[in-house]
Amino acid sequence: MAICIPVNLPDRSYNILIEKGSLANLGGEMSQLSLGKKVLLVSNPEIFDYYGQIAVNSLEKAGFAVFTHLIPAGENYKTLDAIAQVYDSALAHRLERSSTMVALGGGVIGDMTGFAAATWLRGVNFVQVPTTLLAMVDASIGGKTGVNHPQGKNLIGAFYQPKLVLIDPDVLKTLPVREFRAGMAEVIKYGVIWDAELFQQLEDSDNLASFSQIDGELLQTIITKSCQAKADVVSKDEKEAGLRAILNYGHTIAHGIESLTGYTSVNHGEAVALGMVAAGAIAVKLGMWTAGENQRQTDLIEKAALETRMPPLNADEMVNALTADKKVKDGQVRFILPTAIGQVTISDRVTPTLVREVLSPTESGQ
């Protein structure tokens, strides 16, 4: 039975549908949304090989005319040049304002497809079909779209909500173990910032490190709870005027790590895990939460088989990278810091000196 989570917004409300096997009914779900008949399905070659034909068959069965555009996998393809190629496909297939771009893939595909949809003809319809755990619980929900700039991650983008987010947990069976663990970092994040009960469930679970070992019912629960947390926050603050900033917990340091490692050696979820470790250590130093709570967070991250020790990075370069973060206000880097399991706050008390201390090898992971 499908779980339906509404994202309630003033102008563009939509539903998150979670159901095993639901990819085969993508066309049926979209046919209820009064969309035009043309669909541009955007994916990467590997995901398309696994699931593209299921999506295409479902869409065509529902009467849609389907065209495809494939983008090579990887954060280094998240560029304006790649977006221009999506535009070329949209032009070649004569997409209209009533047409729909469907993102079938992970966070990179979702971000790029959403940005292309937001900007082509000043906005065409957009549907998210996430195929990674990270995209299911985070990137596909909330309307953040965009691409990277050489100087920073997601600096070019727009808020543009999808018409539908369709989540089929069955597609996770082909997700590489490393990517599954990356998604668990975002799940843990929701436990720290919003849902102490979810955090406790994760602590009590037997295995979090792979799809093949995690309990199927638990997986459905953590996807649902994570989506509900994201939907609750986005419904209250669509464009990050205040509350929504808490979703960036761990991301300030994470984006710096990704930038300094060239978006190659450390993936987004791994960087978020390291960012949460750093934020937790900063919060302890500022007296905002206890060493015991911080250790619980570190232990849970390690339970998901995620690294908690910083890679060798130049602390000064990291501090400089933080100044390009989107959360900078009046030149001051704002950190999301934990105050208890299930609660965080926005702080401007974090100095460059404190960041350097936490990033030093003797401090990281503590």
Curated annotation (Swiss-Prot):
A GO term for molecular function: nucleotide binding
Does the record carry Ribosomal protein as a key word? no
The EC code for this enzyme is: 4.2.3.4
> Which UniProt keywords are present, listed alphabetically?
Amino-acid biosynthesis, Aromatic amino acid biosynthesis, Cobalt, Cytoplasm, Lyase, Metal-binding, NAD, Nucleotide-binding, Zinc
What positions does the entry give for Zn(2+) binding?
186, 251, 268
Cofactors that this protein relies on: Co(2+); Zn(2+); NAD(+)
What reaction gets catalysed by this protein? Answer: 7-phospho-2-dehydro-3-deoxy-D-arabino-heptonate = 3-dehydroquinate + phosphate
Key word Metal-binding present = yes
Q: Name one GO cellular component term.
A: cytoplasm
- The residues the record assigns to binding NAD(+) are 107-111, 131-132, 144, 153
* Intracellular or extracellular location(s): Cytoplasm
The EC class name is lyase
What intrachain disulfides are recorded?
Answer: none
Mention one GO biological process in which this protein takes part, according to its record. Answer: chorismate biosynthetic process
Q: What is its main location?
A: cytoplasm
Pathway per the UniProt entry: Metabolic intermediate biosynthesis; chorismate biosynthesis; chorismate from D-erythrose 4-phosphate and phosphoenolpyruvate: step 2/7
Q: What does the note under cofactor report?
A: Binds 1 divalent metal cation per subunit. Can use either Co(2+) or Zn(2+).
**Family, similarity comment:** Belongs to the sugar phosphate cyclases superfamily. Dehydroquinate synthase family.
Q: What is the role of this chain? A: Catalyzes the conversion of 3-deoxy-D-arabino-heptulosonate 7-phosphate (DAHP) to dehydroquinate (DHQ).
Q: What is this protein called?
A: 3-dehydroquinate synthase
Species name: Microcystis aeruginosa (strain NIES-843 / IAM M-2473)
Source taxonomy lineage? Answer: Bacteria, Bacillati, Cyanobacteriota, Cyanophyceae, Oscillatoriophycideae
